[in-house]
């Protein structure tokens, strides 16, 4: 089992140390873990200025040495809005032996998604979100799209479940652009912890992705504490098999490798 979305105390909202996360991963049967610490370069974002790349690198080296016979450890980043301020992001990537980058949209119009959607109808909120995601995928440097339809985490209680058909053209454009740039999709199991009670992205989007020829998938728990490592990943593997996918992907130095499921 691979968990490719995790946060330690190197992220502003992480609650467990890297050592604690590794120990939990081993107990839960995770064979490979990728730490994807938050990176934001926009002042006002709660992540801004938090990540110390030198300290992060030292912790990775320490845990790789300590758990080398029990756990494969990869070094990643989750970059918020990677298409913005790309010159500011570059120093965090260059010279730091990054294995994997998740590109996510956490903010829109310089507002947190929970603030952005206030007072908006569902169609306006989701259209704005998917347009920003398209810009991110078109311009940003990433290996996978993080939690593709994340907005539903915040919008579900306000606007209910969204209809994919209302945004089908935009979603298709995002997926086609991702495939053309060799960018994969992350399946994020934290959706099971939200009111929507479904993964990010939904199965409908995964089916679209497969029909368009997409293959690259990673699966992550979005753990922010040790007790959440690996949560709901085995049933997602089963679902992927049922959808016709045969592999998930591992990354080393930004290069993907298929791993049978």
What is each residue range found by the language model?
Residues 1-83, 92-97, 154, 159-165, ...:
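An N-terminally biased module of ancient metal coordination in phosphate/nucleic-acid-related enzymes
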Residues 175-223:
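Glycine/small-residue-rich hydrophobic helix-like segments
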Residues 38, 148, 214-230, 250-253:
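Short acidic/histidine-rich active-site segments
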Residues 1-3, 32-34, 72-76, 99-102, ...:
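Structural preference for beta-strand elements that scaffold enzyme active sites
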Residues 47-181:
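Extended substrate/RNA-proximal surfaces in nucleic-acid metabolism proteins
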Residues 5, 25, 37, 101, ...:
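Conserved, mostly hydrophobic/aromatic
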Residues 95-100, 140-141, 204-217, 234-249:
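Structural recognition of alpha->loop->beta junctions
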């Amino acid at each position: 089992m691979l968990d490719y979305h995790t946060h330690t105390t190197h992220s502003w909202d992480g609650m467990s140390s890297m050592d604690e996360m590794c120990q939990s991963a081993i107990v839960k049967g995770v064979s490979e873990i990728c730490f994807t610490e938050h990176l934001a370069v926009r002042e006002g974002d709660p992540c801004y200025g938090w990540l110390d790349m030198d300290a992060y690198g030292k912790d990775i080296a320490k845990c790789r040495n300590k758990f080398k016979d029990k756990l494969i450890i990869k070094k990643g980043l989750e970059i918020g809005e990677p298409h913005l301020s790309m010159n500011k992001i570059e120093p965090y990537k260059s010279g730091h032996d990054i294995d994997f980058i998740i590109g996510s949209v956490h903010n829109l119009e310089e507002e947190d998604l929970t603030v952005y959607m206030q007072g908006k109808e569902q169609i306006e909120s989701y259209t704005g979100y998917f347009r920003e995601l398209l810009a991110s995928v078109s311009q940003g440097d990433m290996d996978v799209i993080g939690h593709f339809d994340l907005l539903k985490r915040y919008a579900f209680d306000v606007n209910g479940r969204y209809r994919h058909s209302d945004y089908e053209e935009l979603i298709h454009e995002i997926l086609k652009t991702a495939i053309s740039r060799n960018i994969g999709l992350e399946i994020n199991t934290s959706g099971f912890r939200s009111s929507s009670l479904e993964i990010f992205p939904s199965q409908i989007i995964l089916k679209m992705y497969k029909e368009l020829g997409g293959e690259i998938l990673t699966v992550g728990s979005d753990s922010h504490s040790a007790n959440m490592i690996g949560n709901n990943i085995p049933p997602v593997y089963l679902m992927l098999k049922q959808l016709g996918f045969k592999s998930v992907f591992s990354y080393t130095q930004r290069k993907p490798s298929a791993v049978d499921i």
